[in-house]
Amino acid sequence: MAAELVEAKNMVMSFRVSDLQMLLGFVGRSKSGLKHELVTRALQLVQFDCSPELFKKIKELYETRYAKKNSEPAPQPHRPLDPLTMHSTYDRAGAVPRTPLAGPNIDYPVLYGKYLNGLGRLPAKTLKPEVRLVKLPFFNMLDELLKPTELVPQNNEKLQESPCIFALTPRQVELIRNSRELQPGVKAVQVVLRICYSDTSCPQEDQYPPNIAVKVNHSYCSVPGYYPSNKPGVEPKRPCRPINLTHLMYLSSATNRITVTWGNYGKSYSVALYLVRQLTSSELLQRLKTIGVKHPELCKALVKEKLRLDPDSEIATTGVRVSLICPLVKMRLSVPCRAETCAHLQCFDAVFYLQMNEKKPTWMCPVCDKPAPYDQLIIDGLLSKILSECEDADEIEYLVDGSWCPIRAEKERSCSPQGAILVLGPSDANGLLPAPSVNGSGALGSTGGGGPVGSMENGKPGADVVDLTLDSSSSSEDEEEEEEEEEDEDEEGPRPKRRCPFQKGLVPAC
């Protein structure tokens, strides 16, 4: 039954407009519309209501058409069609054929054997160049199931639907089943849907149309949501990535039906289907280490080129500093890399760069904020060698001759004079410091007494002690009191010691 179904669909795809109208009229369906609408209607009829009478009618129309073709004289030259591109062979008036579908000697099932891996309702323009999508480093393409095909609105409604019926080959099914799981329920080999603008000027990045919804067979597929935005008035952004359809598909020879719902707001979009193998950041890092290491001598020549004297410049550069700290994570570099298109010598860590782009792909250099795609990344062999040789520095300087020297942080030097160290003891009850005395080793010890006292040791003047806790007024008053006391002692003799008043409410500090 499956073989007959595939054969019937191949026959339907070879029909002219008149054949399609006869087939649809045979089952009582509408015969109006463009050719791609009639083809879609007939394919849906074959897919969901293929009775023996309908199959007999399809075969009769097919044999009638090719019997007439074979009886004709030599055909006009024609251009063969790409089996993966769905082109409308008639203009919008439905009268003038643009390109003949096939010649009489072409086996039509062979020509259209791959058409089931395409969108029956999504015609592409033959005269326009093909839409190209950018390569995704984390997705290694195995097969192209459907080339980028434009989403064509069928009416004036804002919400459009475009169905697709396709089947996987046994080899493709085997690849998916035998692939490892990246995480529970997610295979490494996947069937992904990619959507982009229909712009042929340059490779296009993935871009979703408004109100997008993807239905695979009888279940809706999850589409990445919007990033939360805290800024008022700023439209939230959406990560546009390939949509994995594998978990909702029939992994057998049965046909799969995909329906893309999208908002028609003036912009043109194209869709494509690919069989891919998803890679991890560690696999990309290993590949980069294998094919992306730049020889140290080439890196050294680049340093010389950067520091070469420019005769037109009035400023001569004698060296350039390069940090060994990754600007992404502020940690020491382990795998220094940069893009070949970058003008700077500063590197970032390839490990963290790949991990960050695996979560949120931007592929922007963290040093110069310019594009740094994966296929332009290189590992700096010279800086890798420096990292292994210089483990105690966080920065180096490249010199004019290509050599380098580490830049280490200078130790703080003491600005105190090279003299005797003054030992300041605790103050007595009157707030006076004991006078220091110089011992034999040059250190000063504390002795009883108050006030600044100078000492002589081996004919050299001693150091003065200044109490920094007292202000200038209090120190001058203390000096006057001491002078008065000394005069009184000289005249009247020694006076009794004063007793320091002690308040009961005070608590000692120790």
From Swiss-Prot:
| Modified-residue entries (N-acetylalanine), positions | 2
Question: What InterPro entries does the annotation carry?
Answer: PINIT, PINIT_sf, SAP_dom, SAP_dom_sf, Znf_MIZ, Znf_RING/FYVE/PHD
Which Pfam families does the record match to this protein? PINIT, SAP, zf-MIZ
Q: Name one GO cellular component term.
A: nucleoplasm
Question: In what ranges is there compositional bias, type Acidic residues?
Answer: 476-492
Query: What family is it from?
Result: Belongs to the PIAS family.
Q: Mutating residue 347 to A: effect?
A: Inhibits TCF4 sumoylation. Inhibits beta-catenin-mediated TCF7L2/TCF4 activity. No colocalization with TCF7L2/TCF4 in nuclear punctate structures. AR- and STAT1-binding
Recorded consequence of changing residue 128 to R = Some loss of sumoylation
The entry's protein name is: E3 SUMO-protein ligase PIAS4
One GO biological process term is: negative regulation of DNA-templated transcription
What catalytic reaction does the record list?
Answer: S-ubiquitinyl-[E2 ubiquitin-conjugating enzyme]-L-cysteine + [acceptor protein]-L-lysine = [E2 ubiquitin-conjugating enzyme]-L-cysteine + N(6)-ubiquitinyl-[acceptor protein]-L-lysine
SUPFAM superfamilies according to UniProt: SAP domain
What lineage does the source organism belong to?
Answer: Eukaryota, Metazoa, Chordata, Craniata, Vertebrata
Residue ranges annotated for the SAP domain, each copy included: 12-46
Q: Answer yes or no on keyword Repressor.
A: yes
Q: Which UniProt keywords apply?
A: Acetylation, DNA-binding, Isopeptide bond, Metal-binding, Nucleus, Repressor, Transcription, Transcription regulation, Transferase, Ubl conjugation, Ubl conjugation pathway, Wnt signaling pathway, Zinc, Zinc-finger
Which sites are covalently linked via Glycyl lysine isopeptide (Lys-Gly) (interchain with G-Cter in SUMO2)?
9, 35, 56, 59, 68-69, 125
Q: Where is this cross-link: Glycyl lysine isopeptide (Lys-Gly) (interchain with G-Cter in SUMO)?
A: 35, 128
Q: Name one GO molecular function term.
A: ubiquitin protein ligase binding
What are the residue ranges of zinc fingers typed SP-RING-type? 311-392
Which species is this UniProt entry from?
Answer: Homo sapiens (Human)
Gene transcribed to yield this protein: PIAS4
Tell me the pathway: Protein modification; protein sumoylation
Provide the domain comment. The LXXLL motif is a coregulator signature that is essential for transcriptional corepression.
Modified sites of kind N6-acetyllysine: 114
| UniProt region (Disordered), positions on chain | 443-510
Question: What is known about what this protein does?
Answer: Functions as an E3-type small ubiquitin-like modifier (SUMO) ligase, stabilizing the interaction between UBE2I and the substrate, and as a SUMO-tethering factor. Mediates sumoylation of ALKBH5, AXIN1, CEBPA, KLF8, GATA2, PARK7, HERC2, MYB, TCF4 and RNF168. Plays a crucial role as a transcriptional coregulation in various cellular pathways, including the STAT pathway, the p53/TP53 pathway, the Wnt pathway and the steroid hormone signaling pathway. Involved in gene silencing. In Wnt signaling, represses LEF1 and enhances TCF4 transcriptional activities through promoting their sumoylations.
